[in-house]
Amino acid sequence: MTNIVQGIIDSMVMHNPFMLPLAPVYKATENSHPAAVTMMTAWRTITEAGEPSLLAIDTTNGTAYFALDVSEGDDAKKTVLRGRVKVVDRLITELELFMNRNRGDHGFSYSAIELPANYAELMSPPANRTKASREYLYNLSDALFSSTNNLSVSVDDDCQFTELGWKVIDTGVYGNASSDPLGCSWPDDHPTDDNARVALVVDEELGFVVTSGIIPGKVYPYQNVSAFIPNRMTSAQEAQDVWVKETEAEAEITVVSPFGATGDTLEVLQYYDGKLQAMQINVYLSGPNMTSPWL
């Protein structure tokens, strides 16, 4: 599986999708829209890429998830490439790709620069760790976007929280909140998706589990940038509504108008030693009332 993932990446750099071991009939999407790999942007624009910074492999399901920074010609402004692949009899039957180029693609966060170092920590867990069972990792994935699974999850004090490679710092719209990176949390009030794709990749060795959820929300102005806030996070949206009214009344800065949006999310969790060790929220935004072709 490692060789197949690296082969996908190498074929992009070589601009040669024909070298991929595709099944006679395969499913493929790029940034949520279906396309033949021969028509995808990744094979046209990526000029440099190395090995995955994060690689989760599910030997039972024949699936893998990978993420890394890639160059599309400008090494100073790299792109985050994320992908999920399914293999049957050494042939690719499913390929789900996302290319995030800046903060707006995700909704707030992004750092292709920080990604390699942050993800490297997760690829080298302690050798003496207590691994979670496949059944528990599945249940963890099921609970992530569930409205009925009330799994209680312990969070490690050093749990790494990232969004698109970035250890998120949020000083708030008034600029007076903490400048320390945010930590992980397992809140009771979280975005839900009853049609979430659960346990797409379960890596029992490293403790990774990958889940997909389609999350409706709204893009709000946020200081001089913008932020995607899921509809389920009502208090956060209400607070932002207040700030928007204050800002409009003061008329001191220009802000983007609020818009409805949908977050296509591939979330990665890492769990071992009986605690959540890492949480990665990876989103690609589209318009309101959208869904996924994988459903």
Predicted regions: what they are:
Residues 1-295:
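C-terminal and inter-domain tail/linker signature
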